[in-house]
Amino acid sequence: MTELPVIHEVGQRSKGWIHSWETSAGQDGPGWRLVVFLSGCLLRCQYCHNPDTWNMYSGKEMTIDEVWDEVKHYVPMLRRGGITFTGGEPLVQASFLKSLLRRAKEHHLHTAVDTAGFLGDRVDEDMMNDIDLVLLDIKCWDPEKYLELTSKELEPTLQFARRLAEAKRPVWLRYVLVPGLTDDPRDIEGLAAFAAEVGNVERVDILPFHQLGKSKWAELGLDYKLQNVHPPSPEQVRSAIETFKGYGLNAC
């Protein structure tokens, strides 16, 4: 099991760290969503546009009740969509996330978890049952490139993807297309074949690399290695989409 930071328990409920939240439509799960960003991440993705979420103790420490006092204002809207938990990496705060998911299901809300899957072994059966959709970010198909790109191993993510398939949990696959890093046609084809094989990938989102997070790296004094990398061309994006479609997947 992967070691995680300590989360303080308050009675039968968890207390954890919330970085921020926002509303969205369509990209973070079906319908109108409240997107809750949990603090903390063990990956160090070179293209991360939210490095300010890496610190486990950034944001605001809150109880489940305090979080829900904020969420309840959005519930009428969320009936037409749901709530998505992201980060950072939400599974860093696994017990806190589990309590948040349970509270959401008690209010009959659709739930989604946006995760890189590296900590998927922290998802027990009860938590799995409270997740309606997983937005699975697979950063790269080649294990060596994955390690260079994220600082972590690829295999735990693939194991989690297989578990999700066994549990018949729907997945939206997310893939950031970075010229020179994740745009190798062989890697894209390998991931497409894997996604088709597991059989539970409902949608594939090809996300073009951008430089919108560059200023955050500078503010945090971090070494940003992609200063001179340009976004992929429309042709590169279309090519990646067509590769996934060639395996019978719904890609956009």
Where are the predicted features?
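Auxiliary Fe-S-binding modules of radical SAM enzymes
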Residues: 1-27, 74, 179-252
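Canonical Radical SAM [4Fe-4S] cluster-binding loop centered on the CxxxCxxC motif
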Residues: 13, 20-62
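Short glycine-enriched, charge-decorated loop/helix-capping segments at active-site entrances
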Residues: 52-56, 147-153, 221-229
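Short, conserved loop/turn and helix-capping segments at secondary-structure boundaries
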Residues: 61, 151-154, 231-234
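Conserved AdoMet/S-adenosylmethionine-binding subsite of the radical SAM
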Residues: 68-82, 87, 91-219
